């Protein structure tokens, strides 16, 4: 930090006016100085003043942001993950409010170019916000899962077993899906999704729901050990369409369940 101040002061010496790094006793503005100690002064300006007085606070804020972004996943901490989701949900209205306020401010001082840029930014932010809600509602319509409103999620794996529907959020569409059964616990993509399972409970197909369509994966191979309720089953893509992942079980065959439309 001292080196940066010395460098800034050297630039200030070449440019002219210099200001001390510390604030004066009567206000928030930097104190004008003609002292010869170059390292205690730097070039005047709002940005430099802000960095000099708030660099520690910003470093703490950025450390928190890094922690939230890096460890904001359910497998690490649900609390940190909740903070991350809250930040992502609040970004759209905050940015929209800031761009509208900036557009109003620029219009008041007749800076029409910046006014136009602010309006364009507000429109882009609003469109992105609407697109998020549209895609989330489309995904929720197929899965009935609140994971649909996660801004990071674009696909949801749906597995029907034991008369229940289990879901797992995915970042993309997999080529194939592997279900692993370990001592009665069912795992998908390395995550536990159900317990108390046996080999007879494994489904003949699983689904991956997207906002625009549902992809059906059909069982093509499995290796199971009944005595220990352990094994695996592999599913590959077979068809895609406007299917519901919430398949009914009342007097319907497997084919009828599969073709149960949204």
UniProtKB/Swiss-Prot annotation:
Q: What is the lineage of its organism?
A: Viruses, Riboviria, Orthornavirae, Pisuviricota, Pisoniviricetes
Described function: Component of the viral envelope that plays a central role in virus morphogenesis and assembly via its interactions with other viral proteins.
**Which family is this protein grouped under?**
Belongs to the alphacoronaviruses M protein family.
Q: What keywords appear on the UniProt entry?
A: Glycoprotein, Host Golgi apparatus, Host membrane, Membrane, Transmembrane, Transmembrane helix, Viral envelope protein, Viral matrix protein, Virion
PROSITE patterns, per database record: COV_M (PS51927)
| Annotated segments matching region Interaction with N protein | 237-252
In terms of one coarse class, where is the protein primarily found? virion
Which Pfam families does the annotation name?
Answer: CoV_M
Q: Name one GO molecular function term.
A: structural constituent of virion
Segments on the Virion surface side according to the record's topology features: 18-47, 99-112
- Its domain of life reads Viruses
Residues modified by carbohydrate are: 32
How does this protein sit in the membrane? Multi-pass membrane protein
Name where it's found: Virion membrane; Host Golgi apparatus membrane
Q: Which GO terms describe its cellular component?
A: host cell Golgi membrane; membrane; viral envelope; virion membrane
Annotated membrane-spanning segments are 48-68, 78-98, 113-133
Assembly and partners are described as: Homomultimer. Interacts with envelope E protein in the budding compartment of the host cell, which is located between endoplasmic reticulum and the Golgi complex. Forms a complex with HE and S proteins. Interacts with nucleocapsid N protein. This interaction probably participates in RNA packaging into the virus.
Q: What is this protein called?
A: Membrane protein
Which gene name belongs to this protein? M
- Intravirion face residues: 69-77, 134-262
Q: Where does this protein come from, organism-wise?
A: Porcine transmissible gastroenteritis coronavirus (strain FS772/70) (TGEV)
